[in-house]
Amino acid sequence: MRILREGIAYSGKDTPKYSSCSFPSVCILSDGRLFASFKAAARKIPDNKTDHAIYCVSTDNAESWSDPIEPFEPPIVDGKPTTIRTLYFVEDTPDNLIAVINAVDATMEDLPYYNEETEGLKPTYILVSHSHDGGESWSELSRVQLDSYYDMPLPLTGAPFKAKDGRIVLQLETNKHYYETEYWVHHSVLAFSSDGGYTWGDEVTVTDNRDVYYWDQRASQLAGGEIADIFWTFDRRKGDYINIHFTKSTDAGRSFAELSDAGLVGQPGTVIDGGDGSLIVPYINRDASPEIRMARSTDGGKSWRDELVVYNFGRSIKEKQNAGMNDVWSEMGKFNVGHPFITRLLDGNLMVYYYSGPSTHRTDFCYAIIEE
């Protein structure tokens, strides 16, 4: 592997309201356009009152990017105003482009998104919209309710994707309500649509463990038909992270194999197929200076080895060893590099993208084009 070039899809350095960029995603449309979506805000933490969900478009394979587009006004949900936290796209067919957002209750806008006393989250909703003209216009946003986790805060963990059986897949995790005091059991969940993203259900709970949080799941469709799922993993008993864990489904996401230790330390992105039948994943290791690396597995995900350093931040930002959940959330709020993801461009090269910048509230949507 080698890096061919690096770039920035969007920098908010001259636009204060878009100064902090995070939650990056790239959707490649059938007409060759790239939609690079992300959260942009005046500040990263602690509240959500300045959040915007925007995207930029490239028509030349990530050589250049349009000015930012903000496609949706924050919706009213259950009679309450919201802010839009994240935006993702997936193309079902050329005439059915689906946008999926997370909207957050804005009536509590002065409060932190995460409640340190209860470990609950503000009300976080999933909504979808459809475009039949390639993103020129959009239908009204409609809320996704899941029977298994009705009315719970449901943060998305990455972009939706199309499974081999034609269903559209949402990836998310469950959280408890802001003031709920009961013990929180984290779940990573997939939900499915068989009608092009208009109705949702058939939820599959991928992880369910009282003591270990398999969170920030990154699920993806592999060429051979399997769905890969990989997790940033936190052991509540130890009060700190453990190795990344990995699993696969061979039945279109209806069930998953037992989780395995990937032997990698950090926060992963999505898994994609390598050109030689291997699997490739980007991940960020924050043990010292944050470093985005590429790892490869030649045995179907049983073991992984590092192959390339995509980006090194150049200085350590880890303040101390974590002691529990509140330390973890506090640390996440200060990150100014992270969320690495990967996609294969139409010319066969890889695009690894992530957010990075000089400070917590001043980060860009960055990427590297890599020859495998």
Predicted regions and their residues:
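Asp-box/BNR beta-propeller blade signature and adjacent active/binding-site loops
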Residues: 1-372
